């Protein structure tokens, strides 16, 4: 079976896959050591990124990070550690130091943080069903929101939704502002959205879907001056393009404004840009972004979506 999976993954990369994504923390008991090593071996052989949601134990436990760092070093796989702030929690500085040491020793490891302070996932996720999530996140039922209604849960409503709507989603509020500040100041940190799927506006999701980047520009660049404007922009554009260029040279034309680059441009006012999306009302548009250009075509004009404008094109890996 492992050999068959290896063939299928290689075929996917041949057909334009940009890398390998692994929700390891959500599949903790379903992925064997041999399967995990095989995935890293393919990423190393093909030199495409493998993005991993590492296994989590107790609060801030770095064993899951060390596991994937060792595999990346042994297989020469480009490793992307997702959501370092939400996984490392109060030990984010230690996690970043481990990544720094690995990179200094020749590894190729990157990571990202979100700009909103809650985690969002299914109420039936492995972390809730089979582990001490209250101890892990240092929260209780009252720190968890049912996304569909915005209500704060109790033990009784948690058990009710788990039983009656196991596919429903929750936001669990546990991330501290100082953790995100530590992460954002790491020299090559990237900012990610990671919103839950938004099928239509009637189905609630995370505010990440509409406010991630405007929150960085408004809160962390302008208001708190944690980042310079150029640093903030690089964390949301250039660094991602440079990372993904390992899989596709098309990304050499992304994340930068220069002759020959793709005309994907966000025009914003640094004095007014602000995220308005919040938990419970996740689709509120940001202010201070009057124009967005994709592939040379306006998709936002005077702050409004341009009806029928879909110029975006998928990018495939070089194979």
Task: Specify the residue positions occupied by each region the protein language model found.
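Active-site neighborhoods of metal-dependent hydrolases
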Residues: 1-30, 69-73, 78-229
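Divalent metal-binding pocket/active-site signature
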Residues: 2-3, 11-67
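Divalent metal-coordination and catalytic microenvironments
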Residues: 16, 53, 112, 194, ...
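Structured core elements
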Residues: 19-21, 51, 80, 110, ...
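Flexible loop/turn segments at secondary-structure boundaries
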Residues: 27-31, 57-61, 87-91, 117-121, ...
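Acidic, glycine-enriched loop/beta-strand segments at the rims
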Residues: 170-174, 180, 227-234, 242-283
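N-terminal alpha-helical segment
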Residues: 213, 236-237
């Amino acid at each position: 079976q492992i050999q068959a999976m290896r063939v299928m993954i290689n075929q996917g990369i041949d057909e334009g896959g940009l890398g390998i994504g692994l929700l390891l923390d959500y599949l903790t008991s379903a992925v064997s050591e041999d399967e995990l090593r095989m995935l890293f071996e393919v990423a190393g052989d093909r030199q495409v990124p493998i993005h991993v949601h590492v296994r989590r134990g107790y609060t801030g436990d770095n064993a899951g990070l060390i596991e994937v760092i060792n595999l990346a070093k042994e297989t020469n796989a480009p490793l992307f550690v997702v959501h370092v702030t939400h996984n490392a929690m109060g030990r984010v500085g230690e996690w970043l130091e481990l990544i720094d040491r690995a990179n200094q020793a020749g590894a190729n490891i990157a990571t990202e943080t979100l700009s909103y302070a809650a985690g969002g996932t299914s109420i039936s996720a492995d972390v809730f069903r089979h582990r001490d999530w209250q101890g892990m996140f240092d929260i209780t039922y009252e720190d968890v929101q049912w996304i569909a209604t915005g209500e704060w849960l109790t033990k009784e409503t948690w058990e009710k939704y788990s039983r009656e709507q196991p596919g429903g989603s929750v936001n669990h509020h546990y991330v501290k502002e100082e953790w995100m500040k530590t992460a954002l100041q790491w020299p090559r940190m990237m900012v990610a959205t990671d919103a839950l799927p938004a099928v239509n506006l009637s189905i609630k999701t995370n505010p990440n879907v509409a406010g991630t980047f405007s929150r960085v520009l408004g809160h962390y660049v302008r208001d708190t001056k944690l980042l310079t404007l150029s640093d903030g922009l690089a964390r949301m554009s250039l660094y991602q393009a440079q990372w993904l260029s390992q899989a596709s040279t098309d990304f050499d034309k992304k994340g930068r404004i220069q002759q020959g680059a793709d005309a994907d441009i966000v025009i914003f006012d640094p004095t007014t840009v602000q995220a308005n999306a919040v938990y419970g009302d996740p689709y509120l548009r940001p202010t201070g972004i009057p124009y967005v250009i994709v592939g040379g075509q306006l998709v936002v004009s005077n702050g409004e979506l341009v009806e029928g404008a879909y110029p975006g094109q998928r990018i495939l890996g070089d194979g």
